[in-house]
Amino acid sequence: ASDLIGQAEHDNLAQCILISKDKSLIDKVQNEISKQLKEILRSSIARQSLSSNGILMHISSDKKIIEVVNKIAPEHLELNLKNYKSFIPKIKNAGSICLGKYAVMAMTDYNVGSNHILPTNGSAKYSSGVSVNEFYKRISYINLSKKGIESLGPSVITLANYEGLAGHAQSV
């Protein structure tokens, strides 16, 4: 419950989702959220976020859970499971993944050195957190031999003509 509230109190657009195979856990979390919201400073923001973007979801199979997680592509994913290691190779879309019950999102925000600039709103499907690579200037170097252009050129001409870029095609 605290982890969901911790995400929800960021702003009213924060996405806060719990997925569990245990229906009784979902009920306990729902009740605990109600209790904890009475005690936090940013309760109005957290309430709005949970109301519009909060979901407590019961899914009975690990396979379906993984499918849903990869579709959601969360900014933060907490695998609060004993068998979290079996999930790791199957999760393809998440900004960061907290492993086990002690690796909570608040630790990633403030203390453990992971990146706090993460892809939001499902953009973890095609993007990663900001890294030092974003601050490197890179140059691509291309060198072709006569044999290389003769081999690759026809496909470039076809694509250029298809796109209506005659100058591109003629340059080959």
PLM segments and residue spans:
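Short amphipathic alpha-helices in soluble, non-transmembrane regions
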Residues: E32, V68-K71
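A short acidic, often aromatic-flanked loop/helix-cap motif at beta-alpha or helix-coil junctions
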Residues: K63-I66, M105
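C-terminal core of ALDH-fold dehydrogenases
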Residues: N70-V172
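A short alpha-helix capping/helix-coil boundary motif
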Residues: A46, I66, Y110-V112
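ALDH superfamily catalytic-core signature
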Residues: A1-K64
